[in-house]
Amino acid sequence: MRKIDWDKIKTRLDALLVIDEYLTDPSEDWLRLVIKTEEDYGLRYLIDNGSGDSLDVILTDKMILIKGFDHESSLSQFAADEWNQDIIDSFYKGLDEKYLSLYSKDQKDETTFFIWYDGHAHQQTYQDQDGGEWLLSYLFDSFERFHEFVTDYYEITVDKDLLRKLYMEGFLSDLELKQLIQDD
């Protein structure tokens, strides 16, 4: 796996958060795609698509932790004929207890892939793994993917230059945010 850039992940998740907060009615918080919390240990972003899939990204000063859950994955213990705790435990094998403790038992149970990055990427994988790594696409490795997702998911037309600025910087002014969404 290639180098994971803390600043880029934060900026791209912040960009998605800005769009999601702007377009989601505060009275309908349950419809949010992404939620950001600031914790003692760092920043946490939870992306939940409302269909049983989630991506939980924790950014500490020393680590990046990325936990994914794809409810259709063969690694989901909720869909297994027989629960296999060893599969879940193996995802976290080698992770320092101080970081492991950031997840509740229920959160750990909802894991179909887990990556941590401390300068080197660590991931326990399985043969024929289909653990939902597609969820990593929420980290948007290109502006084109971000643009396509935003316009398709939210069904909006945007000022491409302002969206690019949001993608690169992770924020827009209030005025820029109002100008971002174009009337069809």
Predicted regions and their residues:
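N-terminal domain-onset segments
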Residues: 1-52, 61, 76-184
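Short, solvent-exposed aromatic-acidic interface loops
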Residues: 69-76
